[in-house]
Amino acid sequence: MRKIIHVDMDCFFAAVEMRDNPALRDIPIAIGGSRERRGVISTANYPARQFGVRSAMPTAMALKLCPHLTLLPGRFDAYKEASRHVRDIFSRYTSLIEPLSLDEAWLDVTDSPHCYGSATLIAREIRQTIFNELQLTASAGVAPVKFLAKIASDLNKPNGQYVITPADVPDFLKTLPLAKIPGVGKVSAAKLENMGLRTCGDIQQCDLAMLLKRFGKFGRVLWERSQGIDERDVNSERLRKSVGVERTLAEDIHEWSDCEAIIEHLYPELERRLAIVKPDLLIARQGVKLKFNDFQQTTQEHVWPQLNKEDLITTARKTWDERRGERGVRLVGLHVTLLDPQLERQLVLGL
């Protein structure tokens, strides 16, 4: 049985700002783009969250909820340096590390000799070391599979951890809301609940063939996760191949103008995320994703040398007109595919 830890830094960007400027600690702050540029919030500290400010929220909405919010543009060099330090701490315990972003990662400590081989003690020691060396807090989840470790890391935030032992898995899953499974958004959860499916226990009673017919590949994922099945390894070789941002909508949209407005809100966040890993914004391809209210989705992309909003809007309009039909749209996403490092090196050498 594997021992997987998911470590998630608490309000990471905001926490770095509060550490470096103690005057920010007790006031609502958020990192994000300006209201004038239709920016979105990257993260907010806990005082801001008490007003309802959340990640991926349009800045204009955040300022309506919290007019005295202190908005910071972000210092991504500082965040990347803190992230590198955290990764160094991880590497003291295992070489099997799979980063999801600057502020979270999976660790496989199945064969780690540290802390008598106890994943619970390793997670606790990692969190304490992060605090001692960076004055930042982290939360952790411990479980036998990746998706449960990720869910567990969110159950005792901030600065805590939650352990799901192999013996705990059946009872934990029985009452686990489907909305907690990564990839199941609010709209999906609502549609499932309309079918009488609210928990993993409900899915356990379903026929897999029915789920496949109703939801396609998504149905298989639901069934497997509800059984506690997640065969994905912690992939330490993983290289980031793409950057994306998407929004699951509270209500389906049927008008192109609504879709275009969402793209306008999403684009600054895509630009910000890409700048962290590719400051020159050079890419291989860019594209859009639309997910419809029948759970089908479509992706359209093409070769493009640099991030470009107008091209994304044109691509989205073409996709909207040609593939939507009469269906409502429940998710809009933007993404870019990064240049292969070897190809990029060849291009640079050739200049």
UniProtKB/Swiss-Prot annotation:
Cofactor note: Binds 2 magnesium ions per subunit.
Record-annotated site: Substrate discrimination: F13
A cellular component annotation (GO) from this entry: cytoplasm
Predominant subcellular localization, coarse grouping: cytoplasm
The protein's Enzyme Commission number: 2.7.7.7
PROSITE patterns recorded: UMUC (PS50173)
Matching InterPro entries: DNA/RNA_pol_sf, DNA_pol_Y-fam_lit_finger_sf, DNA_pol_Y-fam_little_finger, DNA_polymerase-Y, DNApol_IV, IMS_HHH_1, Rev_trsase/Diguanyl_cyclase, UmuC
All copies of domain UmuC, residue ranges: 4-185
One of the record's GO molecular function terms: magnesium ion binding
Needed cofactors: Mg(2+)
EC class (word): transferase
Keywords: Cytoplasm, DNA damage, DNA repair, DNA replication, DNA-binding, DNA-directed DNA polymerase, Magnesium, Metal-binding, Mutator protein, Nucleotidyltransferase, Transferase
Subcellular location: Cytoplasm
Catalytic residues (UniProt): E104
Protein's job: Poorly processive, error-prone DNA polymerase involved in untargeted mutagenesis. Copies undamaged DNA at stalled replication forks, which arise in vivo from mismatched or misaligned primer ends. These misaligned primers can be extended by PolIV. Exhibits no 3'-5' exonuclease (proofreading) activity. May be involved in translesional synthesis, in conjunction with the beta clamp from PolIII.
Protein name in the entry: DNA polymerase IV
